[in-house]
Regions:
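Terminal leader/tail segments of proteins
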Residues: 1-98
C-alpha cells in the first residue's frame, strides 16, 4: 500500500522507502533501520501514523518506541524481541537476531 502520498510502501509487517527496508518483521523480531536521511525518518513517522489510523495502536507504539530509541542512541538499527519483550539499539542487527 502506498504510504500517504510519498515514495514509500507499507503493510503492518514492513515499510519500504526508495527500495530500502526501514521496518520489517523477522520471525519474533521487529527490526527498524534508522536510515540517515530526513526523508526516511519522515517515512517512519508517517508509518507510525498510518498504523494508528489503521487500528494497530499497540504495533504503532512499539515502532514509535523503537524510533525514539534509535534517534536517542544514534544507532543504525533498533531490534525488538517479541518473546523477551526487550529493545536493543545496535549497529548491526544480525548479532541480535538469532
Amino acid at each position: 500500500m502506498q504510504l500517504y502520498n510519498c515514495n514509500a510502501t507499507c503493510s503492518t509487517r514492513d515499510l519500504i522507502s526508495y527500495n530500502t527496508r526501514l521496518f520489517w518483521i523477522d520471525g519474533t523480531y521487529y527490526i527498524l533501520y534508522i536510515y540517515p536521511s530526513d526523508t526516511s525518518k519522515m517515512h517512519i513517522r508517517k508509518y507510525i501514523k498510518w498504523l494508528h489510523d489503521n487500528d494497530c495502536d499497540a504495533h504503532a507504539d512499539i515502532v514509535q518506541h523503537m524510533y525514539n530509541l534509535g534517534i536517542k542512541s544514534k544507532k543504525s538499527f533498533v531490534v525488538y524481541s517479541l518473546i523477551a519483550d526487550k529493545y536493543k539499539a545496535v549497529d548491526d542487527y544480525r548479532h541480535f537476531v538469532k
